[in-house]
Amino acid sequence: MHFRLFITMFAALSGTVATVFSQTSDETEWENVLETLLSDEDLSSDAREELSFMYESMHESPLNINTATREELSQLPFLTFKQIEDIHAYIYMHGPMLSLGELQLTGNLDYETRKMLRLFVYAGDVPVKRQKLRLAEVLRDGHNEIVGRMDIPLYLRDGYRYHSPEELERYPNRAYLGNRLSHSIRYSFNWHNRIRFGISADKDAGEPFFKRNCTGYDFWSPYLYVKDIGLIKELAIGNFKVQFGYGLLLGGGFSIGKSMALSSIDRNNQGLKPHSSTQEYGYLRGAGVAFGRGHTTFTMLASYTPIDATLKGDTVIGSFKEDGFHRTELEWSKKNNTSLRTIATNVRYSYRGLRYGVTFLAEKLSLPYKGHGGFMGFSTDFSLHRPRYALAAEFSVLDGNVAVLASQTFRFQNGWTMNSVFRSYSPDYMSLHTNAMAEGSVQNETGLLMGLTHDSRNLKMSGYIDLFMHPEPKYGASERSNGMDLRAEADWKLGRRDNLYATARFKSKQKDCSYTGQLEYCITGRYRLRWTHNCRNGAELKTQLYYARYDFIAEPISNGWTLTQSYSKSFLNDCLDIDVTAAAFYTDTYDSRISVYESGLRYSYNFISLYGKGTRIAATIRCNLGRGLQLSLKAGGICYLDRDEISSAQQRIASNHKEDISVQFISKF
């Protein structure tokens, strides 16, 4: 006992010394981790926003490291299965952790991984037995949070200008139905991550507020989620998401990128989850329940979800509208004009690293889409985890079309890890809920992704090569096509205060060329170099250089450069945080655009796309007012040097610059 106490005190002291030397504020550290988790270039803007919200929620409601299950820890993509097993083995052998400093005693957690993990877990007490539900205790001990946000543009788009009645009668879509303000409000309740309920509401810029409906906001998302109550393992009512297998049949609503697929495709979070964000697509509205007994879990769900669509002749769905905008008469006419009925069941068995599941799905659209009035299918999946290797696969059949996904991971003693992912999707395979990894969409594709990772004390290296083929014609390629994708990254820790990070990506894929009348290879390259320095006064300086190149035989070569400088500092004992980012960009065309991460407000998407020639500056101030209150302000502006106006149609701004302000208020009680 005395030896354990000594080791615990030593570990806690070591962690404290490391924190003192790093001198980085919690807010700055969190922004750095969030940027790392969202750095996969293949992620769409919707996927980044959804993942950002998920990680923010996990950060605000951390897990108790002493009671967290493998499934809960597997939601963190930077943790390997071996590291999760080592954490559980340490707790089993030595008892509950008294502090997070003991993480360094588990054997396989390096300093950077421990630093990231600290933002999502805490070392808490282990109850002798699971707490019984008592309404008074739930309401007393639960955590409430209210988040309000407003975005205020300091410019005027053409859609908000005055249009005469005669003009609107002839061109009704030239004017937006609402004002230019965008705002949202969210309330959430959380009791030990076992009972969660809340509601989110959102209005995008240009959408009407109390003009077209009596509810005010354009989108509402109510939800109730209950976990581990008797035989009920999970219960979701309202808006929720579901993930079974590895995303071929029923996924979480967004596509994962290749880097994320290599690290986490074999441990995607399974089951039901509440949809608490303001994303207006990719969720189900109804109810789902999972019953668990022993190693077996049975899940069933039913939903009726209104969706937006572009119709052909009011009788056939031409395409689904996923942006959630309802600003003009035309966009408003597409609001909830279609519906989707969904029934699904899943049975999965888990025991000592082995998991096997079977899923059945039946769906019915209110209008036919591509000749389908509905979909019926099933999938079967399995995974096997061992300390040195992992295997996973899913086989799905939907209306007679087949999709297959298989992955393997091998971990070697010298710090090297080898991953591979094979996928084969039929040309006509189509699931409305897939989030499986793909070069394009989850259909008409066969590919093999192979990756290699090496971790050492001060250097992390990783890379992959993806060889893919589209056996049938697709958009942009009128016949069978193929391609290759290469990516490499390295992260060097240069002493206690400096870090150097570099990425390089090369992609070559075939597409139609009007110049030669046949398929030609389009070659793109994207490179990034980042230097981070932690100053002695607690500030952080971050300098980044980006370069992009686009080369296609029928078009001039397009180059793009961006240089950014960021400064972060905390004042008044972390009561005030300031982040400033300045960028200068020079790109020839949109094809050589560059995506840059900015520090921003909580629960928000903080990547911006820069193209053209100009400068960008943004500043974020967060003030902790005490008693769970936080007020944040972000101001940003961009100035173009190569144009006199920005965008076109209703989005046109009659100026070469635009500025905006965002305000956020958070109350926790």
Predicted regions and their residues:
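Outer-membrane beta-barrel biogenesis signature
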Residues: 26-33, 111-115, 119, 123-146, ...
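Transmembrane beta-strand segments of Gram-negative outer membrane beta-barrel proteins
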Residues: 134-171, 189, 193-199, 235, ...
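Outer-membrane beta-barrel proteins
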Residues: 202-219, 273-280, 396-398, 548-555
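Exposed, low-structure sequence patches enriched in small/polar residues
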Residues: 176-180, 284, 302, 338-669
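N-terminal, intrinsically disordered low-complexity tails/presequences enriched in Lys/Ser/Pro
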Residues: 21-62, 127-141
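Amphipathic, charged-and-aliphatic alpha-helical interface segments
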Residues: 48-98, 117-122, 203
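Outer membrane beta-barrel
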Residues: 214-307, 412, 417-432, 575-589
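Bacterial Sec-dependent N-terminal signal peptides
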Residues: 1-26, 669
